[in-house]
């Protein structure tokens, strides 16, 4: 079947409307979008059952038959007067049913649609203009099973849903061939009056509005709701669009909402129509009315003021008390899908917030741990909100909303709001030195792990049976309280660490701390939420005891599942703090040490003054012997000693410490430190050998990395094993210089690789390696 035969026997092409989008899988398949009108060339394709050969936009290909709907042929072309006569002869028809002349049959060569507009059509032929497909809708004549008469559908393009589309049953007619309305029905409104261009429809006043025309919905909304909403004869077209106003006039919102409901009744403006030509920040805000001197409307129409008649209002809404000012974050002002069809509200709040007042009342009535949990959560996430908003109502709303927003997985806006409130809570810096910070984080980590293990002790295969749960319910309840308390203490410390990390320039470390803290905080919120629900039911055995395998976890199971993952998250955060302890707590350590050493300052000052006098007396005694010994040495050795003495870096001259002055306080290096010293010296020797043999860059890059890694391990081990303050300061001084030499080695390696085979760059790398080797030997000799 290659087409349908007409009355004269000539084949006519069938038209079909696309029901779904089609993305081609091969070059022979035809791509089309939902609503496109295709011309069926052949329905019986050999060896391709269920596929039709179609034509779209001058391109021929195969299309799946189950995605197309054959349209009945439109009536033959005719002049405009008979068309209007048909409307007059059938007054019983609804105003939405029109007969449309069939479009001309496309030729073998695709003709640009612009040619239809450039040449004015003859005055005798009244054919409606078919606009360009990307910007306007297509007109389709279709027979349906439910309606025996012909109906007109305006099918929108999916890529143009944000633009003001043409209304249903309204067509754009060229100005030269526009026909007057029917004379027999003067009471009817003008049928075809739409701006011919997009610029005119956007900027100028609508001519249809001046004549009392209906303001159309977009075609997608018209198909869904099945009718057109109207506006009460606006005087200016700019009244349709929402415009931002100053915030000082926001106090009259309640009166404006009541007036808009009385004036408009059941009619409403689509929520998204006012967003076409208004700034994004004004979409979710309310605006006061602007009185006009003349005209039936005394106020501008704004987005939140017009009710939508199609959907009932929600059951739970906030009581808009004028004495309470709610602090709504800016991220909540973005309109969401679930709030597109609700009654007007001054504040665009998340979906979870309407349940907050009722939950607050229940928690207020309950006693014991429930109240504690509420206080903990509010102190955690809303301490800053409490200082900004003194009203107790706003504090409770924001605290409860922060808990609900963290748990909401269906709203990205609520999750963003929780993270933003997290960032706004700027934690203070921890006044701790490195040792105290490590001890604190280790103790808090152990406390959390032990509290979680006390709960896991009761979890077994039969722990939810009534007999087992009845015997252990009190202990399980106490274990959940300990988990909440220990995790809250750890979060206090973690917030302080984050505040300390905010002063660093290392963005990677800040990101690690922030992400890991967010993970722990999310787990804490889930534990709080589930524990509150368990407290609300009173830990009833009738609710918690079960002998069956549950398909979905209840509150107690969810608490256990989340608590099981907390120790691992705590361990990761503690590892980050311990590994980067010097960066985080270096400034605090430097500030505290002079205060702690103040009582011994006079003693040390006197000791530093007396030591040079003793050394001067010993030098006077030993001077003749040293001169005699120096005269006996060969001149080459004397010159070498002078060169070494002048070439030494002053920072590398570490004095013989208290290990020689006081033998009782001799430093005893552990086996690990000795191994690291030996490995570092050996790695430096291997690097020097590679540079002497002119090895390729790949070789000495690996060897340089090994030196840096071993050097870092050595410094960490020395700082951990040295606990006495006197020795610790000397070791920190030598370790700091060792780290600077390791950094210089890394920079020299990078420069040598980039400039390879430059002899100067390789020589500089060799010099840095020799400096590092010399300082390592001196450092080791000082400690032993």
Swiss-Prot record:
Q: Name one GO cellular component term.
A: cytoskeleton
GO BP of this protein: cell adhesion; cell migration; cell surface receptor protein tyrosine kinase signaling pathway; positive regulation of cell migration; positive regulation of protein tyrosine kinase activity; positive regulation of substrate adhesion-dependent cell spreading
List the InterPro entries: CAS_C (IPR021901), CAS_fam (IPR037362), CASS4_SH3 (IPR035744), Serine_rich_dom (IPR014928), Serine_rich_sf (IPR038319), SH3-like_dom_sf (IPR036028), SH3_domain (IPR001452)
**Phosphoserine PTM positions:** 197, 246, 302, 373, 387
| Superkingdom, taxonomy of origin | Eukaryota
* Record's comment describing the protein's domains: The SH3 domain interacts with the C-terminal region of PTK2/FAK1.
Q: What is this protein called?
A: Cas scaffolding protein family member 4
Please name the source species.
Answer: Sus scrofa (Pig)
């Amino acid at each position: 079947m290659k087409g349908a035969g007409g009355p004269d026997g000539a084949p006519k092409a069938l038209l079909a409307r696309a029901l779904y989008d089609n993305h081609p899988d091969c070059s022979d398949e035809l791509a089309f979008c939902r609503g496109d009108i295709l011309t069926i060339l052949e329905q019986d394709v050999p060896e391709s059952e269920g596929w039709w050969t179609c034509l779209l936009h001058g391109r021929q290909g195969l299309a799946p038959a189950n995605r197309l709907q054959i349209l009945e042929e439109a009536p033959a072309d005719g002049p405009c007067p008979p068309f209007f006569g048909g409307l007059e002869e059938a007054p019983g028809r609804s105003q939405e049913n029109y007969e449309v002349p069939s479009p001309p049959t496309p030729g073998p060569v695709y003709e640009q649609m612009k040619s239809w507009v450039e040449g004015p059509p003859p005055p005798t032929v009244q054919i409606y203009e078919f606009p360009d497909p990307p910007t306007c809708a297509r007109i389709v004549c279709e027979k349906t099973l439910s309606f025996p008469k012909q109906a007109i559908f305006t099918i929108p393009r999916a890529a143009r849903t944000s633009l003001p589309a043409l209304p249903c049953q309204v067509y754009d007619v060229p100005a030269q061939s526009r026909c007057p309305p029917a004379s027999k029905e003067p009471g009817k409104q003008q049928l075809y009056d739409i701006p011919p261009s997009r610029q005119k429809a956007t900027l100028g006043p609508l001519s249809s509005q001046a004549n009392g025309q209906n303001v159309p919905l977009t075609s997608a909304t018209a198909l869904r709701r099945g009718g057109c909403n109207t506006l009460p004869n606006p005087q200016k077209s700019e009244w349709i669009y929402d415009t931002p106003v100053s915030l000082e006039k926001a106090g009259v919102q309640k009166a404006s909402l009541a007036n808009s409901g009385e004036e408009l009744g059941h009619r409403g403006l689509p929520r998204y129509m006012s967003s076409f030509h208004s700034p994004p920040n004004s979409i979710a805000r309310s605006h006061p009315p602007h009185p006009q001197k003349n005209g039936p409307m005394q106020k501008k129409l704004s987005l939140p003021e017009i009710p939508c008649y199609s959907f009932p209002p929600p059951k739970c809404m906030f009581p808009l008390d004028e004495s309470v000012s709610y602090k709504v974050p800016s991220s909540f002002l973005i309109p969401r899908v679930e709030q597109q069809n609700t009654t007007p509200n001054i504040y665009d709040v998340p979906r979870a917030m309407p349940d907050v007042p009722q939950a607050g009342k229940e928690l207020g009535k309950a006693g014991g741990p429930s109240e504690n949990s509420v206080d903990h959560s509010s102190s955690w996430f809303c301490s800053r909100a409490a200082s900004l908003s003194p009203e107790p109502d706003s504090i409770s709303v924001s605290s409860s909303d922060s808990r609900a927003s963290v748990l909401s997985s269906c709203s990205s806006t609520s999750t963003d709001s929780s993270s933003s409130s997290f960032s706004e809570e700027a934690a203070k810096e921890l006044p701790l030195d490195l040792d105290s910070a490590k001890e604190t984080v280790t103790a808090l980590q152990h406390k959390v792990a032990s509290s979680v293990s006390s709960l896991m002790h009761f979890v077994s295969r039969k722990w939810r049976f009534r007999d087992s749960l009845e015997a252990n319910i009190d202990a399980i309840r106490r274990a959940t309280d300990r988990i909440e308390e220990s995790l809250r203490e750890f979060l206090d410390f973690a917030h302080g660490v984050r505040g300390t990390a905010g002063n660093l320039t290392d963005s990677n470390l800040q990101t690690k701390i922030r992400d890991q803290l967010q993970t722990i905080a999310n787990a804490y919120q889930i534990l709080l939420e589930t524990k509150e629900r368990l407290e609300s039911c009173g830990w009833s055995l009738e609710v918690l005891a079960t002998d069956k395998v549950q398909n979905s976890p209840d509150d107690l199971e969810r608490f256990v599942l989340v608590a099981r993952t907390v120790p691992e998250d705590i361990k990761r955060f503690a590892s980050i703090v311990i590994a980067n302890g010097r960066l985080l707590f270096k400034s605090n350590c430097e500030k505290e040490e002079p205060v702690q050493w103040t009582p011994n300052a006079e003693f040390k000052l006197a000791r530093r003054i007396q030591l040079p006098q003793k050394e001067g007396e010993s030098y006077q005694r030993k001077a003749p012997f040293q001169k005699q010994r120096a005269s006996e040495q060969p001149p080459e050795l004397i010159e070498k000693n002078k060169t070494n003495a002048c070439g030494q870096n002053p920072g590398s001259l570490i004095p013989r410490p208290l290990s020689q002055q006081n033998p009782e306080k001799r430093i005893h290096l552990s086996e690990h430190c000795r191994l690291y010293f030996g490995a570092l010296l050996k790695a430096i020797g291997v690097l020097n050998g590679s540079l002497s043999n002119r090895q390729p860059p790949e070789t000495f890059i690996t060897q340089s990395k090994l030196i840096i890694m071993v050097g870092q391990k050595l410094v960490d081990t020395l700082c951990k094993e040295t606990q006495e303050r006197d020795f610790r300061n000397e070791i920190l001084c030598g370790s700091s210089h060792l780290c600077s030499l390791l950094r210089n080695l890394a920079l020299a390696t990078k420069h040598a690789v980039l400039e390879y085979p430059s002899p100067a760059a390789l020589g500089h790398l060799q010099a840095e390696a020799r400096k590092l080797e010399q300082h390592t030997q001196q450092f080791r000799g000082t400690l032993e």
